[in-house]
Every structure is written in structure tokens, then in C-alpha cells.
Amino acid sequence: TKNLKNFFLNKSKIIDVKFDKIILSPGININKCLLSNYLKKNLQKIISDLDIFYEFRPEILTISITGTNGKSTTSKLLHDILKRHGYDVRLTGNIGNPILEEKGIKKNTILVVEASSYQLAYSKYFRSKYSIILNISNDHLERHLTMKNYISSKLRCVTNQKKNDILSLIHISEPTRPYL
């Protein structure tokens, strides 16, 4: 895109620039980073790498897998099964290549996306045709602060699903059920 600008900042640089979108790396905790105040004022503009991918390639079949435990194992297993059956399948997200680094994606490519709560927390419009939520238990509360926030992050993988999309809930515990 022609109008894309990069800004490199240090502690002494004051941000007074207006952005349409802010793509936040999943590893950045907005409560503890140098740009905390700016990011908190611009929460509605923060999106994820998953959103950027979906914005440019909505036709690509994605299968998102999230949960507190078992994401990597389940993602790798599903990837290997699909690959063995001859599909052009990629392992992305929190495992494999970052989704925006995948090259050679064609219309028939399937993406298995291991989606962490950090990736999903600021996702606005990523859509996954198939979403699998394995389990949700107390974890990452140092980042999400409350169980409600953590569960809300995990559920973002289904927020934009359509009527014919599929959600699979596996081993959902009692504390999670009120949020579903």
C-alpha cells in the first residue's frame, strides 16, 4: 500500500501522529510498554496481524485453534493430517510462520492458525471458517487481568463467524460456560 508509513520511536519521542490503524505485535503488553498511554487512548484503532491477513485474503480457508492448553499439539496434528491427505496446508500463528510471512498462498490453501489470547485480544474482524476452542482455564491473568478478559480474548476467534461456519468446543469448564 502506498500510504503505509513506518515510525520508529525511542523514549524521548512524543507521539502526536494520528494513525488509521495500529498493528500490535502479540508480544506487546499495552499496560507495560513505553507507548502505553498512547495505545490506551487509541484502543479502537489497534488490530492484529490476523485482521490484516483477513482484510487482504478473506477467501482463504482458515481453521483457528485456541485454548489454554493443547493448541500447538492440536494445530500440528491437524496440519499433518491435512497435509498427508494432499492439501496445501500451512501452520501459522503462534506456531510455524507468522501469518503475514506465509508466501505462495493460493485460493485452495488451508491455514491452520494457532491463535493465542494475545493475538486474539485486539482482533477486530478476523474470521475463521472453522474455530476450535480446546479449553479455557486460569492463565495469562498477569496480561489479561481478569478471567473475563481472558475468556473474551479467546472467544474473538468466533466473533465474526457466519451462520454456516463451524465452532467446536472441546472440554469447556464450568467457569467458562457463562461467557459462551
Language model features by range: what are they?
Residues 170-180:
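Single conserved hydrophobic/aromatic residue that forms the stacking wall/gate
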Residues 15-17, 26-167:
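Phosphate-binding loop of NTP-binding sites
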Residues 1-2:
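NAD(P)-binding Rossmann-fold cofactor-contacting core
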Residues 5-18:
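Short acidic low-complexity segments
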